[in-house]
Amino acid sequence: MRITGTERDADPDGRPVYLLGVEIAQRYRHAVGSSSPFYEGLEQGVLRATRCTGCGASWFPPRRFCEEDLTETDWYDLPGTGTVTAATRVHSPPPFGGIDPPYILASIRLDGVRGGITHRVIGAETPQHGAAVTVKFIDEAPAHPLLAFAFAIEGATP
């Protein structure tokens, strides 16, 4: 906790008035149920998906049960590469904060799994359909766990 105070003017009776500022930072952890391995992976710098123990289908976003045969799934690490299927430049902040506009959002088909993700792409240029991207983990503490990573266009200069 950090407390700051500065003298400001005076009240109507001539007494000094102080502005007191209090900043409190709290860190907490909570379980996110069967998706916990995904968030633990983010802390470790890897994207995780699930694979069906019955038919072998792979899923991202991760699923506890396979959509094909309802068998339980196992967790595994993705290579962190994919292909842009659509992209746009966004000029308003996201509802959860943590990103200053403008920023780029892209639908990305991840390599090796069914499904994909709509997520932020780092860089000044909006990627074209078919552009190859690689996951990049952000060094600073994110405002939301899903902001712990973004994608970079392969071969692009930052």
Ranges and model annotations:
Residues 1-47, 152:
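A broadly conserved sequence feature marking short terminus-proximal activation segments
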Residues 30-36, 72-100:
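Short microdomains enriched in Cys/His and/or Lys/Arg
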Residues 40-81:
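Cys/His-rich short segments
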Residues 45, 75, 99-101, 128, ...:
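Short coil/turn motifs at beta-sheet boundaries
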Residues 58, 81, 87, 124, ...:
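Residue-level recognition of beta-strand microenvironments
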Residues 61-62, 102, 147:
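Proline-rich low-complexity regions
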Residues 85-121, 129:
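Glycine-rich active-site loops that engage anionic ligands at enzyme catalytic sites
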Residues 116-158:
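Well-ordered alpha/beta subsegment
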